[in-house]
């Protein structure tokens, strides 16, 4: 079976706040955007049942299209915002702060305070040459490339296929327009 609403409740609540909708199905969840502008949010990552840190990268891509300023505090892992450099090269307006913008309890003792990314939107994304750095950051680059105007070249996509089963087939089923080198 697929994911359940209960397992993803925090993510689903944020998804709705941004402007998305979803239906719980027997074998998973169907997501869609009902139209209208995306809304900015302020979130902090956390361990389950909080907002999962693995979801912050694709959320940040979506927030580049939200109207206003969003803030994402990363409180679980260090150095999770490196992927934003490529998004800025594609036209995003993301500023990463090495110490948080608010007083949040540390999750891991003796580590620096959490990082925060401030995303100001909406900003049109344009095509660029992007190299996949890691699994989740790279998948976010791929999402941004698909959302961008113009052509992007994404290299090192083998990393993504190791972490997401049949992702190329799934992208095609969603109507993504891309070519693989021969």
Language-model features: locations:
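Short, structured segments at the rim of ligand-binding sites
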Residues: 1-182
